[in-house]
Amino acid sequence: MTLTEYLKTFIGRPYIWGGNGTGKTAHGFDCSGLVLEGLWAFGLYTGADTTAQGLYDHLTKTATWKEGNVDNAHDGDILFFGKSLSKITHVAVALGDGLMLEAGGGGSACKTAATSTGFVRIRPIRKDVVACVYLKK
């Protein structure tokens, strides 16, 4: 099973701000919680729960991850979104063919996305993607 195959098993789970699939948030995820769930499951990240910005900062400082081309994202690449590399507000996983898997929806701000329309879903890659990080082979 690949990272994206594993994360697809969570499609339809609700968006819960601060959710990482455990404890009080066992039934849902926020954007970083979903990506972290996959990275933890495959032993690709051993750190604590963090934000999208914190995950980007961590991964780009390790020798096992490399920055890629945001216009050519491949299945399993980690995508980061925001106004700049120092103002990242969202994270998702690329599926290839211009699609991504994310926990989000329901509003433009993280806290307001926790509505009946916020969930884990597949959608086209957003235009505000600022970075793409992939696992070195």
Predicted regions and their residues:
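N-terminal capping segments
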Residues: 1-60, 74-75, 82-90, 101-103, ...
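Intrinsically disordered, low-complexity boundary segments flanking structured domains
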Residues: 2-3, 66-68, 116-122
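Short acidic low-complexity segments
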Residues: 63-74
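Short acidic-glycine loop/turn motifs at beta-strand connectors
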Residues: 94-98
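Active-site or metal-binding loop neighborhoods of secreted/extracellular toxin and effector enzymes
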Residues: 116-137
